[in-house]
């Protein structure tokens, strides 16, 4: 959620930032609604003070004193009725909060203006890409031919956008998760967490998924939602807390299943493992101070890139433009891995600095030692990485002419010494 005080004091800048996000100016409307809310709040405070004063006087008067006592009783009763009316008005005046809940984060000054992904800025590339490579198959062709990846029978069980992995591909999925967790915990100091994947609506609201993206998640019949990313569970570990400054940055990593309805993705990536309803992902989250969040963003992006470097996968890092950024982010890097079967780069990770946007929603603060003052933390998240898309990249980049898949060197030990994935044999 955005800072209403900042909006009041920076109306022109606020409207300009909204335009960069292709949203109509809202400052005047917000000022109007905020003014109404503040007026009601001030009246409530005045009446509460008057009630306190009159109640104190009433407590010091003999009930048998007659008109004075009865008059004060009537005054207190009238004040209570007025307070009830004002508090009802305040509760019904939800338009301001509803409006603020629909507004995305403000883009950082370094974010380029742009309409869509075609206007993202290239930051760096890593690894060699052979644009002229011939006869490179896509991952689903390879996996099905090896009889280690099943879509047809799985569709009878769960429908479209699901997959079943078997044999050495199932082992590769497990190996990738263990490898990623080892790198993030051992080399980058993230604390491994095993969080719940069923969360309440307020947790989804805190992280920015609700109310705007309700149709993109799966809801149960008893008030829970399946997480679209472990970011939801991890950032909410500090909801409604005050963290000692010396405990920051708080770096967390989790490996969980993720669930997405893929609403609005009809017709996109209908074949293969690129866009599934259920997939596994290693997720990074950091809770830090405003002064450190910029450097922490680079640190987390480096952690994600390191996984691809160790796997020997070519990639490029893009700074997203204003028209392509996520709702809660103020600055995002996308890491795109090269897929020779598709002859294009595809997103494999997003690394976002959300500033205090999520923290304001979930009331997450920190304070310096010996101080009574508190400050909103900054929250950051990064894919570290999605297992399925990483497997896609390995299949396409490490495929051999006979259809087998060479296991990347760093995964051989995780695969029990297996160096090549071949067709499944009964």
Curated annotation (Swiss-Prot):
L-serine binds at residues 229-231, 283, 383. The keyword Ligase applies. HAMAP family: Ser_tRNA_synth_type1 (MF_00176). Consists of two distinct domains, a catalytic core and a N-terminal extension that is involved in tRNA binding. GO terms for cellular component: cytoplasm. ATP binds at residues 260-262, 347-350. The gene is serS. The lineage of its organism: Bacteria, Pseudomonadati, Pseudomonadota, Alphaproteobacteria, Rickettsiales. Keywords: Aminoacyl-tRNA synthetase, ATP-binding, Cytoplasm, Ligase, Nucleotide-binding, Protein biosynthesis. Belongs to the class-II aminoacyl-tRNA synthetase family. Type-1 seryl-tRNA synthetase subfamily. It catalyses: tRNA(Ser) + L-serine + ATP = L-seryl-tRNA(Ser) + AMP + diphosphate + H(+); tRNA(Sec) + L-serine + ATP = L-seryl-tRNA(Sec) + AMP + diphosphate + H(+). This is Serine--tRNA ligase. InterPro entries: aa-tRNA-synt_IIb, aa-tRNA-synth_II, aa-tRNA-synth_II/BPL/LPL, Ser-tRNA-ligase_type_1, Ser-tRNA-synth_1_N, SerRS_1_N_sf, SerRS_core, tRNA-bd_arm. GO terms for biological process: selenocysteine biosynthetic process; seryl-tRNA aminoacylation. Pathway: Aminoacyl-tRNA biosynthesis; selenocysteinyl-tRNA(Sec) biosynthesis; L-seryl-tRNA(Sec) from L-serine and tRNA(Sec): step 1/1. GO terms for molecular function: ATP binding; serine-tRNA ligase activity. It comes from Rickettsia bellii (strain OSU 85-389).
């Amino acid at each position: 959620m955005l800072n209403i005080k900042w909006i009041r004091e920076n109306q022109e800048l606020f409207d300009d930032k909204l335009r960069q996000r292709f949203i109509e100016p809202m400052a005047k409307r917000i000022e109007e609604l905020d003014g109404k809310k503040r007026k009601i709040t001030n009246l409530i405070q005045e009446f509460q003070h008057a009630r306190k004063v009159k109640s104190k006087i009433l407590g010091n008067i003999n009930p048998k004193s007659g008109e004075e006592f009865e008059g004060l009783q009537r005054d207190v009763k009238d004040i209570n009725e007025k307070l009830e009316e004002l508090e009802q008005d305040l509760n019904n005046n939800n338009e301001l909060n509803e409006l603020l809940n629909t507004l995305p984060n403000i883009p950082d000054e370094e974010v380029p203006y742009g309409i869509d992904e075609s206007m993202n800025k290239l930051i760096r590339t890593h690894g060699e890409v052979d644009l002229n490579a011939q006869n490179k198959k896509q991952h689903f062709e390879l996996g099905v031919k090896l009889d280690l990846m099943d879509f047809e029978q799985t569709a009878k069980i769960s429908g479209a956008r699901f997959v079943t992995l078997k044999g050495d591909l199932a082992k590769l999925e497990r190996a990738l998760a263990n490898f990623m967790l080892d790198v993030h915990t051992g080399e980058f100091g993230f604390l491994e967490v095993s969080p719940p994947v069923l969360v309440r609506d307020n947790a989804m609201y805190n992280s920015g998924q609700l109310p705007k993206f309700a149709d993109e998640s799966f809801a149960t019949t008893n008030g829970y939602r399946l997480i679209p990313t472990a970011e939801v569970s991890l950032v909410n570990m500090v909801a409604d807390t005050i963290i000692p400054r010396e405990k920051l940055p708080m770096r967390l990593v989790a490996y969980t299943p993720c669930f997405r309805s893929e609403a609005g993705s009809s017709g996109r990536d209908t074949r293969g493992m690129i866009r599934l309803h259920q997939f596994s992902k290693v997720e990074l989250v950091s809770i830090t101070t405003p002064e450190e969040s910029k450097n922490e963003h680079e640190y987390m992006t480096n952690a994600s890139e390191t996984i691809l470097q160790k796997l020997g996968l070519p990639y490029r890092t893009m700074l997203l433009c204003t028209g392509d950024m996520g709702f809660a982010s103020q600055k995002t890097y996308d890491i795109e891995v090269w897929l020779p079967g598709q002859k294009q780069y595809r997103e494999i990770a997003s690394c976002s600095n959300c500033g205090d946007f999520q923290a304001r929603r979930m009331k997450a603060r920190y304070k310096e030692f010996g101080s009574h003052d508190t400050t909103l933390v900054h929250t950051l998240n990064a894919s570290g990485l999605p297992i399925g898309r990483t497997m896609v990249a390995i299949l396409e980049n490490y495929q051999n002419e006979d259809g087998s898949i060479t296991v990347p060197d760093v995964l051989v030990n995780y695969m029990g010494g297996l160096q090549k994935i071949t067709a499944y044999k009964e």
